[in-house]
A protein has these predicted regions:
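Catalytic glycan-binding domains that act on GlcNAc-containing polysaccharides
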Residues: 2-146
């Protein structure tokens, strides 16, 4: 399975577009964060829906909260968190700042629940890591665990 096929499989034909695959690839390269990790966060946060709006004013694909990321958004020139590329850039910039490549479980728990993450955020982190492993397996031509 190639990258576009994976994004389409995960997000469905309507949401898993070539543009989404390209945008994830772009920010993955910019921030040196694995694209399957970003896709896993996108699925976990919004089910790939760029218009997703959570109860805490979390917005877009990666459910970024403007109240907590206003400075980051200003630095990045982000004005619309419902724009997929702007949202991906903001969320991935935060993951990169959390050093997700060094300690994914801890970084993802903070991403989800703040700097003192509750237990549910550790469960979230584990589910993202498991999903990433499954996606990596599909990209490498086999089912995870087979």
């Amino acid at each position: 399975m190639n990258w576009l096929e994976l994004v389409t499989t995960v997000c469905g034909a309507t949401l898993g577009t070539p543009e989404l695959a390209h945008n994830i690839d772009t920010v993955a390269t910019e921030y040196k964060v694995d694209r399957t990790l970003i896709l896993s966060v996108v699925w976990g946060e919004s089910r790939c829906k760029p218009e997703a709006h959570g109860k805490s004013d979390d917005r877009g694909l990666m459910q970024v909260v403007p109240k907590w990321h206003g400075r980051r958004m200003a630095r990045l020139g982000v004005t619309n968190l419902f724009d997929p590329l702007q949202n991906l850039r903001t969320g991935t910039d935060f993951l990169s700042a959390l050093r997700v490549t060094e300690d994914p479980a801890h970084a993802l728990a903070i991403y989800n629940g703040g700097f003192t993450p509750p237990p549910r955020s550790h469960s979230y982190a584990n589910s993202v890591i498991l999903r990433k492993s499954e996606y990596d397996g599909l990209l490498n031509g086999h089912e995870a665990g087979s």
